Amino acid sequence: MKARAIKRAGAAVAGIAILLPALAGCGSSGGNTSSAAAQSGTNTLPQTSEPSNLNPADFSTNIDNPYWPMPVGAQWHVHVSNPQGESLQETITVEDKAKKIADGVTARVVRDVVYDHGKPTETTDDWYAQDKEGNVWYFGENTATLENGKWDRSGSFEAGRNGADAGIAMAANPSVGLTYREEYYKGHAE
């Protein structure tokens, strides 16, 4: 789980760097921001453990959301800290590969590698796809974390397997008060 927090921090840095300027002009309209009002375009965004019920035909591996575009070949290099405060390096690369997810959606593979003193300590293939509304969905990950000299894959999950479900990585129309889940895998990623 500590490596998962590091990975999320790196991905968040990449997304926030793109999103912050866009949200600077967002304000609250005083409207309803409950989960029932979590709308983006014409789709309701997923909340908590409710199933997403996705149509694979509504998705593309071409991710051009203006708040978090993922063109093939894009790469981010970030510095993160582990729970002990030690500096780590992270490289996130949008691969020219796709994966058919268990729920039927074909997703873009994004490789995320965390390095400690130049040696990989975590490698992850994250899976993303964009719906017709422009929302970027997160479909899980195949991850390996180096723990006590051994690679641990227990953080891996895939939407459509063992009750895991997709979530939103970036809404098409982000706004203050918009709520949605990022991922769901009961007992592992909630």
Regions found by a protein language model. Give the residues of each.
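Conserved functional acidic sites
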Residues: G27, S34-E190
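Hydrophobic helical h-region of N-terminal Sec-dependent signal peptides
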Residues: A14-L20
